[in-house]
């Protein structure tokens, strides 16, 4: 059907059922011989499960796409090779600024060329996953970021945020234990990030994750980082990342002359 709509500029696809019927999924995963090019498509939105999304993106090309908005239902594992290829080969989705926000019922990964669009408005790229538990959100976000590494490796400024009452960690979330390795897995794909901004509600979580184990000894972890900007509300918290910063300074200043500021 899409072949008959070469002038299509906006396309929205949505499913209300979280899980696909097995037979329907097999049919969707059967790719066309040649992808359909939608030469003037500028806005694409999708709501459903990852298998449907990935299958659909394998079958289209949208060289002039300006905005991609995705909402996925929660699932145990995210394997999105065609989404990764689609974002990496679409010129309008090569973006320098990203923000990962954790909310009460979902988390989102958004990216744009302007900071104000990432924080408010309509970003060029947004991917939202519906799930409630904080530890599950972090795990899913790590999987999503890993799947989108080709795209996220070009991000230069990254913000980690929490959207809630007073922007503070809820009581039920405080009981969720997130392994430090999972946080590092989430940050790992951002190899081009020069700035990392962290909201005050996540400072303790991130400081523990970045200072545990031998993460600071790995030059492949956040290799381009120059500015670490945690948001502090506690006067005694300004040394939360001191150990991590000191390790990076020792390893990197001597080798590449980069500067790192807190």
Language model features by range: what are they?
Residues 1-262:
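Leucine-rich repeat
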